[in-house]
C-alpha cells in the first residue's frame, strides 16, 4: 500500500481543468491508498467556510466519498487557505493537522508542514503570516460581511503580486533565494524535531534533497504545484517517488 502527499493545487474557478484533474485523482488513484495528505494551498484563496463555491462543494463531496470509503485524508493549512475551518473539514471528511507536525510513516518519523515557515529570509511575508495567524485577527476578519472579506482578499493578492513583480525585476538571484527555503532554517527544523525526513510544499520547486543536518543524513522532499499538471508523492515501505499527473 501507498500513502499519497499533495500540495499547492491552488484550485480556483478560473482553472476548472485543474479541479477536474484533482477530482479524477480522487476517484481513480486515491481509493487504493493507505492515506492522503494535503499539505496546504488546496485552494487559491479561502475567506471563510461560509463563502459560496460550487467548485469547493464538489471537492468536499469527492473527499467525503473517499474518506467514507475508509481512506483517511489529512490537511495542513497553507498560506492561501489558512482560514479553512472545521465546518468545511467536516463536510469533506478532512482531519486538520497542526503546521508543522510529525507523523509515523511505515516505521519512520516524518515531519510534515506547508513549507512557508522555512522561508525566513522573506521577512515581510513572515510578518504578514504572524499577523494573519493570530486567532484574534482571524475572528475579527471572519466576523465581517462577505463583501468586505472579498475586497480584503483581492487587495492582499494585488499587493502580493505587485511585490513579487517588483522583486523579479530586480536581482533574479535574490528573488529566488528569498522565495525559497532558508538553508539554516531547514537545518534547525530537522534538529528541533529530531527527524531525518521532511515533506513540504509551498515553494513550487519539486525535488528530493539529500543533506546533512545536526550530523545526520537527512532527506527533504518538496512537493510540486498543480498549475500546469498534477504532482503527487507516493510513499510506501520501500521508499518514495515524486510523480506528475497529466491533465489529459
Curated annotation (Swiss-Prot):
Reaction(s) the record says it catalyses: UDP-2-N,3-O-bis[(3R)-3-hydroxytetradecanoyl]-alpha-D-glucosamine + H2O = 2-N,3-O-bis[(3R)-3-hydroxytetradecanoyl]-alpha-D-glucosaminyl 1-phosphate + UMP + 2 H(+)
Gene3D superfamilies, sorted: 3.60.21.10
Keyword Flavoprotein: no
Residues involved in substrate binding: 79-80, 122, 160, 171, 202
Known EC number: 3.6.1.54
Cofactor: Mn(2+)
GO molecular function: manganese ion binding; UDP-2,3-diacylglucosamine hydrolase activity
Single biological process term from Gene Ontology: lipid A biosynthetic process
SUPFAM superfamilies: Metallo-dependent phosphatases (SSF56300)
GO CC, one annotated term: extrinsic component of plasma membrane
Subcellular location: Cell inner membrane
Cofactor remark: Binds 2 Mn(2+) ions per subunit in a binuclear metal center.
Sites where the protein binds Mn(2+) 2: 41, 79, 114, 202
Principal localisation: membrane
Top-level taxon of origin: Bacteria
Membrane topology: Peripheral membrane protein
Pathway: Glycolipid biosynthesis; lipid IV(A) biosynthesis; lipid IV(A) from (3R)-3-hydroxytetradecanoyl-[acyl-carrier-protein] and UDP-N-acetyl-alpha-D-glucosamine: step 4/6
Record keyword rRNA processing present: no
Residues reported to bind Mn(2+) 1: 8, 10, 41, 204
Role description: Hydrolyzes the pyrophosphate bond of UDP-2,3-diacylglucosamine to yield 2,3-diacylglucosamine 1-phosphate (lipid X) and UMP by catalyzing the attack of water at the alpha-P atom. Involved in the biosynthesis of lipid A, a phosphorylated glycolipid that anchors the lipopolysaccharide to the outer membrane of the cell.
Family, similarity comment: Belongs to the LpxH family.
PANTHER family in UniProt: UDP-2,3-DIACYLGLUCOSAMINE HYDROLASE, UDP-2,3-DIACYLGLUCOSAMINE HYDROLASE-RELATED
Name of the protein in question: UDP-2,3-diacylglucosamine hydrolase
